[in-house]
């Protein structure tokens, strides 16, 4: 038996020093209970992710499920516009409350937190990824049957952060015939 290097991922030994990989998943807000999480992704912009996210959420809501949308497209949020939401979400020391659509779908988006929705959001990847994590950990979602996450286009920091830190149950890939 050789000396332990504590690099368990490349070691074939089954010893008592073996450590489990670190779990990077974040816990949702303590007042949130989310049953299923579906991410809506694409390789490029303009293919209809936000529309697919909105329609899936609306259809699930019509079938009697409690639904929510986490708008992770921080630099191009469009979910509030799809549902006609305006104004700002309310928050206090307990957390942030998502806004509700006319039919009761819970929505959180950067557009519901900033003063002027026409101002561009020019943030670097780690800041944007941190905001998405905060949407998961700081928003009081309540009891939700299906949460749909509207992702930004591509495979950058935000999708990687979401897939590492949020326990996604399924992924829907939106494409266009080009």
What does each model-identified segment do?
Residues 49-54, 77-80, 151-159:
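Short glycine/serine/threonine-rich phosphate/pyrophosphate-binding segments
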Residues 37-74:
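Walker A/P-loop phosphate-binding motif and the immediately C-terminal alpha-helix
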Residues 145-146, 152-178:
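Conserved catalytic-core segment of NTP-binding enzymes
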Residues 34, 45, 71, 79, ...:
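Residue-level signature of catalytic and energy-coupling elements of molecular machines
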Residues 1-27:
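Cysteine-cluster motifs in flexible loop/terminal segments that predominantly coordinate metals
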Residues 115-158:
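Cytosolic-facing regulatory segments adjacent to core modules
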Residues 66-67, 72-118, 129:
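Phosphate-binding loop that captures ATP/GTP phosphates
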């Amino acid at each position: 038996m050789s000396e332990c290097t504590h690099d368990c991922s490349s070691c074939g030994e089954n010893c008592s020093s073996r450590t489990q990989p670190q779990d990077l998943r974040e816990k949702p807000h303590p007042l949130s209970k989310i049953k299923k999480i579906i991410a809506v992704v694409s390789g490029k912009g303009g293919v209809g992710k936000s529309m697919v996210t909105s329609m899936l959420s609306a259809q699930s809501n019509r079938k009697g499920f409690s639904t929510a949308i986490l708008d992770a497209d921080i630099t191009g949020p469009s979910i509030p516009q799809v549902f006609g939401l305006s104004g700002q979400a309310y928050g206090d020391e307990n957390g942030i409350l998502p806004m509700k659509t006319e039919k009761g779908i819970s929505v959180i988006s950067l557009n519901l937190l900033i003063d002027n929705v026409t101002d561009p959001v020019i943030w670097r990847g780690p800041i944007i990824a941190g905001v998405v994590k905060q949407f998961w950990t700081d928003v009081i979602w309540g009891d939700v049957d299906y949460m749909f996450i509207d992702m930004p286009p591509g495979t950058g920091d935000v999708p990687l952060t979401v897939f590492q830190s949020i326990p996604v149950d399924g992924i829907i890939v939106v494409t266009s015939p080009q």
